[in-house]
């Protein structure tokens, strides 16, 4: 285990299952309040107005942020279940904080910060918690992300398209605290773990945040962050090109790639073929 609090929570859960531990009304009331606030935020908040950088989006690909600022009308709407997914994340955070409290883990609850980049450049955000003097974030993850992405800091760095690392570093800098890590909860199994990020080069990350801020503030021309990749089947190229995983999650992929066709795989032999974002289909595959 990467953090002493992991053992505390696991020990509490084991005792609770054995009938040897319980949760106080004060803690259940706090969890209920947090869930209620999440429902109010998700359903009753006013739509965001003009684009601005926030700690929650500053680490996303710059090409995506460029569209958010300059071409928001071409955004593909999120499906209705996206709201449910956001709610699940809020509920997981509220319950996990309740478990920390029930386990006797002391922490400072969420707070607002302003990251000062100098020259009157600021980005606002809200961190999840401060534990042992370090800023931590709570993430709910799919089973795949839990097992393949949130393995350690290095694996996350290789595919951080949602900007979790800049987000955490920005929170820590804005709060004038050290970088902690992520409490990651598997939405499929209930497993949880701590992914330590204390070894991150914060100055390098902050420089990247500043570069992103300047790129958008100076109205730089659009530039893709990723290129299409060759499709392979049994290690052989098919002649088709498809989007990267990062582009596949982007709400502007159809605007960015006019030839995009999101269709079942043209080469898979499976009964239920995976859906692929093709941007070029070879004639022989058409």
Predicted regions located by residue number:
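Metal-dependent nuclease catalytic cores that hydrolyze phosphodiester bonds in DNA/RNA
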Residues: 1-135, 142-153, 286
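Short, well-structured alpha-helical interface segments that form or flank functional binding sites
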Residues: 91, 95, 124, 163-170, ...
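A short acidic, glycine-rich active-site loop
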Residues: 153-165
